Amino acid sequence: MAASRNASTANTNNAASTAPLRISFAKIKEPLEVPNLLALQTESFDWLLGNDAWKARVESALESGQDVPTKSGLEEIFEEISPIEDFSGSMSLTFRDHRFEPPKNSIDECKDRDFTYAAPLFVTAEFTNNETGEIKSQTVFMGDFPLMTNKGTFVINGTERVVVSQLVRSPGVYFDSSIDKTSDKDIFSAKIIPSRGAWLEMEIDKRDMVGVRIDRKRKQSVTVLLKALGWTTEQILEEFGEYESMRATLEKDHTQGQDDALLDIYRKLRPGEPPTREAAQTLLENLYFNPKRYDLAKVGRYKVNKKLGADEPLDAGVLTTDDVIATIKYLVKLHAGETETVGESGREIVVETDDIDHFGNRRIRNVGELIQNQVRTGLARMERVVRERMTTQDVEAITPQTLINIRPVVASIKEFFGTSQLSQFMDQNNPLSGLTHKRRLNALGPGGLSRERAGFEVRDVHPSHYGRMCPIETPEGPNIGLIGSLASYGRINPFGFIETPYRKVVEGQVTDDVDYLTADEEDRFVIAQANAALGDDMRFAEARVLVRRRGGEVDYVPGDDVDYMDVSPRQMVSVATAMIPFLEHDDANRALMGANMMRQAVPLIKSESPLVGTGMEYRSAADAGDVVKAEKAGVVQEVSADYITTTNDDGTYITYRLAKFSRSNQGTSVNQKVIVAEGDRIIEGQVLADGPATENGEMALGKNLLVAFMPWEGHNYEDAIILSQRLVQDDVLSSIHIEEHEVDARDTKLGPEEITRDIPNVSEEVLADLDERGIIRIGAEVVAGDILVGKVTPKGETELTPEERLLRAIFGEKAREVRDTSLKVPHGEIGKVIGVRVFDREEGDELPPGVNQLVRVYVAQKRKITDGDKLAGRHGNKGVISKINPIEDMPFLEDGTPVDIILNPLAVPSRMNPGQVLEIHLGWLASRGWDVSGLAEEWAQRLQVIGADKVEPGTNVATPVFDGAREDELAGLLQHTIPNRDGERMVLPSGKARLFDGRSGEPFPEPISVGYMYILKLHHLVDDKLHARSTGPYSMITQQPLGGKAQFGGQRFGEMEVWALEAYGAAYALQELLTIKSDDVTGRVKVYEAIVKGENIPEPGIPESFKVLIKEMQSLCLNVEVLSSDGMSIEMRDTDEDVFRAAEELGIDLSRREPSSVEEV
């Protein structure tokens, strides 16, 4: 009863009633839903295109009185570049009104056929002849523009990619102080950093001289720059006379007047060129005052205005003399120790240095802006072409079409999507990894930091990250702290700064009004936590409230002094981190591993949502886009495995197609299953079909397994894991993996390759599963080395003997020289063929030049869990399976239930992640149900208020981060679980159970913690790592085997291993390893021969690497000779002839093209 009565409040998922029931322990009512988790990608791209969705958002924002940009991204660039004038200014070309035609191919066709999902872009171009006033207007095609899918991805050449948002230093003016090493004095410096163009840097050094650095060149006195800008010595003294530093600088400055100063600057910037006044003037103009060369961007102008108290309009993208004066003034005031001043606009401004790692000074460049910058470079290259063509072509014959060359624009867009560091192959391991990938914030990439140069400060957690970037989720390793994840409630404002929402507090009264604040706005306020106790009148219950102030300081203040309050306890963490139950009990380092490992979980054959969730499961799965959601409300009309048809309330029909066993980027299986029935009433946004790793529309990355924390015969030493055979035989942790194999038939110099069943020297049983085209049939079971697609390649014509010519004449072309280049299943792979795609040039398919046919074969394999696979919980508790026990050997509860998995209790205390222990207790409670509806204890009262006092067995529960089940609630509930049919409770109120040894039937001496934990199977599967080689490819130069599984390489017997054999005196073993097993080319062929013929192994020869060493020494002009034991010179082989001779005598076919380098593989 309680559960259903309270389903809507207890259901901490979305407000819509479509989410499955999940009883929540949350005590805090949140005034705000989690926003759309993909908005970061989609809204930015909408702005770039200027589509209807963006226009609607702008209108509603303007109505509500917000200041938002009213120009779309592409519109901005076309306006920026227009007009393109020729050198004399007699003709010009302008662009306006861009529009898109519908894309040529659908998303699925693009994935299938390796196309890019793009729409043709058209622009109206007007050519004006200024002398005659004649205007010619034309619509010009500007190339295909890649479009974003509704999931926030791009399909480029058939693969899904994500453009990651970049975290960069915002343009603006920055003041900094550092201590001089020699004199211990503070050195103050200022930098004006534009969005593009030359930096202007100033500093006051230890001698109190104010210097300026123009465009990273040598330092000069700042007064030289002021004089060059037209100021006289008197004006400088009048403005800056009260500051000792400026007076001293002026005295040291020997330039006389503007001309002298300009020439002085020119000499420093362009040493070796003859200085003239005009050239110097132009140089300075071009550096800082020419909008084509210098741009602060709106955000830079906004930051400069804010810092210096100026009132320039936001579209003033170049510096003004006033900006330079104000910067110098601010710097000398900072040096003089003043703390506040009045800006040009009359505003009071604080004089202080800036913190570069503060999120008020770092901004996000998201997809729209990154692509916009790329298009801008392309258009700038095109502009040069247009100018040249204007001068060379006949004025009468010119039309916009003849002037414009779209190649550079198309090339720069293609280059960005194909090769930029920020355009990444999408992580599609499971829906969460895709979602997190799209919400990633990356400080690397062009214009960002580099791994090597990034110090500790940039990587560290900063107080201004709160509610903006997750402090937990970041990679381990060299990128730690440089790659982050957007916090759950964060959003990006028009300037690119991350905003986070806060509830307004008015005179101690907490309201439901929400304000979004950027990091530097937030610094002015006093902010209370989300869990601050509130009375029924929405005022703070305690006299003093714990708050944060600027710079992360914590303080207690009266309720009336509080300005804002957090909207939600999970405000500071990202989506993945918010899915860790009892996060508040885990050490941050382990939580980081937990958040990262959830992204590596493999979708299982049957998904199961967690018994213990956090209420974030529904929203994350729904927004990730791997489930099918209803676009409109209506009724389900028809359901099958492949599609769902709905009749909508407005009279229209929609058919939703489902993906069946298609391959993700990571080779996991993407399969959607219907969860509605015909005749069901549906509402907009309801989940109609589950995707991979989702159940009933909730994220379901793993399985709920019965865990016991106990040592077992030492098999779970060092985080190893013991599993029950049940998980293997019932396919509890089995997953499906799909591999794609591709082969193409090309035109070669000797003739075309052919896909055929007619392969030389191959027996009929090998071809049994190939159809008449030579392509394997669907449903065939294949193992390593089986032929998937038969293909022959013409071999070079050799001189024929008369007998062969006779045979040719009699039997026709049959004996023609071809060699077998069929596509075979690679080593270590096995599975069932589930799909074949054939593309043929003759049937009109677009294929790359020189390719006549292309065949793709999809092989699926079911991987059961096995020893060596890696499992993990959600708390960073990971381990490798060491042993799979028979069910009858596993420890069992008093009612005979065997546990599924045994973990080592020693893995908990030192790792400081007891969240996993609380999870097993709550998991047990959820599986058994409880009833505390009549109790008077304080903890039970809390549960009665939120409707979590009576729960049926097997009900999913939610314990949201920082607002979940308390320890006293768990302890109390363990005493009131619903007993089994014998009236017994298997787990004692302590949370431990009496377990019995499955082998002897004896009880273990102590009670053992038992409960349900959510276990993930990670993508580190032992089948993908196992590898063995007999013969295979060799490196071109050293002739040694390649390394690594991908190259089918050998195991390196390294320096230290050699020492070990030397220590044992195993001379022959060592000699074999260094010669015939590695790079003695002749020797290894002869050994093959001896083994084939059953003879003794011959003497090893000279290793190839020795010859390489000698060649290297010869290249350094050292003549090295090799002498035998009797002092005779030994000839070194320079050709491979004798190898081929030996091989031919043996009948070993060396013509089979083994890849000879890593590149070729």
Swiss-Prot record:
UniProt keyword annotation of Nucleotidyltransferase present: yes
NCBIfam families per UniProt: PRK00405.1, rpoB
Lineage: Bacteria, Bacillati, Actinomycetota, Actinomycetes, Kitasatosporales
HAMAP family, per the entry: RNApol_bact_RpoB (MF_01321)
Enzyme class: transferase
Example GO molecular function: ribonucleoside binding
Alphabetical list of InterPro entries matching this protein: DNA-dir_RNA_pol_bsu_ext_1_sf (IPR042107), DNA-dir_RNA_pol_bsu_external_1 (IPR019462), DNA-dir_RNA_pol_su2 (IPR015712), DNA-dir_RNAP_su2_dom (IPR007120), DNA-dir_RNAP_su2_hyb_sf (IPR037033), RNA_pol_bsu_bac (IPR010243), RNA_pol_bsu_CS (IPR007121), RNA_pol_bsu_protrusion (IPR007644)
UniProt-recorded name of the protein: DNA-directed RNA polymerase subunit beta
One matching Pfam family: RNA_pol_Rpb2_1
CDD domains per the UniProt record, alphabetical: RNA_pol_B_RPB2
Record note on quaternary structure: The RNAP catalytic core consists of 2 alpha, 1 beta, 1 beta' and 1 omega subunit. When a sigma factor is associated with the core the holoenzyme is formed, which can initiate transcription. The RNAP complex including the principal sigma factor HrdB also interacts with RNA-binding protein RbpA.
GO biological process, one term: DNA-templated transcription
Protein EC: 2.7.7.6
Function in brief: DNA-dependent RNA polymerase catalyzes the transcription of DNA into RNA using the four ribonucleoside triphosphates as substrates.
Keywords assigned by UniProt, alphabetized: DNA-directed RNA polymerase, Nucleotidyltransferase, Transcription, Transferase
GO cellular component: DNA-directed RNA polymerase complex
Catalysis performed (reactions): RNA(n) + a ribonucleoside 5'-triphosphate = RNA(n+1) + diphosphate
